[in-house]
Amino acid sequence: MNPHFRLLCLSLGLGAFIGTSVAWGAFAQLDRPDATAGYLARLLINEVPFPGERGYESEANSQAAMLEILWVLHARIHLIPNGYRQTQVAGVQSKDIIDVITGAGGRRQCEGFFRDASGRFVTAPRVQERIDNLLSIANGGSKPGRFAAMLNYAQGLAQAYVKEGMPGADRYAGLKQVGPVTVTGHAYSWMTDLDAFHPGGNFVTIPDTDDGSLGGNRFFTLRKVPK
């Protein structure tokens, strides 16, 4: 999964889903980190670049990556293809999105997101430090800008998912062929978009021609017929 981005320096309709939250300031706020929607929002934020960070292209590109990451998590629970077991795809057997994020038995699915010795879902200190920094920037001006929009978009996605399920279309749902390889459609993994990173096994890289690179991440689908 994506390493921690180093900071260099949505106000969409989804805002309607934002309920009881921990407010940082006037423009951007996140739900509590011990709430499912707050924890999920922090993952979406952590996995994409913000302005001034490596891999950042645009607000829309990073937001698209957030949505596809959410689709990966959803697919690992609800869209396991024929011929695969959930444990092969997600590393866990669970209907709980928190389990899919944190992994089980010491195996972490998303770097910096895990359960502590008491079983509480927590983040690594560096994750919270970056999020605090992003919130500070978002709420530090005289009016909301890109940082606030991106933070609120992530929280809106998370709240919408927890309350009503997937809030947007999966751009990879109809993908059937990658080169000579027949694939399942949907993405089931994402990693930092570097050639050296690949989840291996039956995962197939989604190419640029199918928008496989979003928000500094490369997305992967699965072979239709497992090896």
Question: Where is each model-derived feature located?
Answer:
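Bacterial N-terminal signal peptides that target proteins for export
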Residues: 1-9
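Bacterial N-terminal signal peptides
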Residues: 10-19
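Sec/Tat signal peptide C-region and signal peptidase I cleavage site
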Residues: 20-26
